Amino acid sequence: MFHDLLEFNEEVLDAINDKNPIVALESTIISHGMPYPDNLTTAIEVENIIRRQGAIPATIAMHQGKIRVGLTQEVMEHLALQKEVIKASRRDISFVLSRKVTASTTVAATMFCAHMAKLPLFVTGGIGGVHQDVTMSFDISADLIELSNTPVTVVCSGAKSILDLPKTLEVLETFGVPVIGYATDEFPAFYSRSSGIPVPQRLNSAEEVANLMSIQQKLNMKNGIVVANPIPVSAELSDEEISPYIKQAHDEAKHMSGKSLTPFLLKRIAELTAGKSLEANIELIKNNAFLGAEIAIAYQKKLFSKKT
């Protein structure tokens, strides 16, 4: 039985009933992460990549008083086009549902909703983390708190490179969150494959990640797992290339804080790089969707083999 505030589309409900692998997806990338029409076309392509691999996509958002798990084309277009769509983290979920307004879900909110829907795997571009001026703003993403207490595996390209990556990893360590480098020994820096920061553990196949998820589930551990998957070589922007633009965007955003900061920085960096950072963002989320589908399939096989 599922909570009555959850509403599944037919494709996801069929997958649940047929015990097929499902990959949860966030919706903030549609409403706040990219400009139109790239946001909509990317969201559709990411879902199709997951389907082609043999899994089912479940993009999550809140609409008309329900947590929608799997979106219609109409709701996707609404998220992509409407300026009034709220960017909802965990703390906003109750308010959004009570007001019956439309909201996209951040990493934290998507993890919460995915866990409610009994979905163990979630794909995104990059997690939030500790902001660079943390000593002044104390701006630490709720994503890190959610990773510490919600058992959902998050496939990402590390944390967004606009953040303080060493401090972000320190917080994850303090919270007991495993950070796995997927076929890499260094923590990816979103637009770049390498940050120069070593990852605590490395795994090299979807089956190995699925086994880790299975062990965590057997131990009844309540935290999530970060699977850090580097951007493809062909799409990456070197640290030397992207860093000056990140610094300039930060300088321009000195008096900004809260939910509006990250969307502003991503948009401004895209402008400064003449769209190169947007192209990189699109390619890394597609790559993460491909890997996420592989892991979901391997994990479902593992679950099924235990019960036969």
UniProtKB/Swiss-Prot annotation:
Binds 1 Mn(2+) ion per subunit. One of its GO terms (molecular function) is hydrolase activity, acting on glycosyl bonds. It catalyses: D-ribose 5-phosphate + uracil = psi-UMP + H2O. InterPro entries: Indigdn_synthA-like, PsuG. Mn(2+) binds at residue 139. The keyword Nucleus does not apply. It is an enzyme of class 4 (lyase). Its EC number is 4.2.1.70. Belongs to the pseudouridine-5'-phosphate glycosidase family. It comes from Legionella pneumophila subsp. pneumophila (strain Philadelphia 1 / ATCC 33152 / DSM 7513). The keyword Phosphoprotein does not apply. Pfam families: Indigoidine_A (PF04227). The active site is at residues 26, 160. Its cofactor is Mn(2+). This is Pseudouridine-5'-phosphate glycosidase. HAMAP family: PsiMP_glycosidase. Homotrimer. One of its GO terms (biological process) is nucleobase catabolic process.
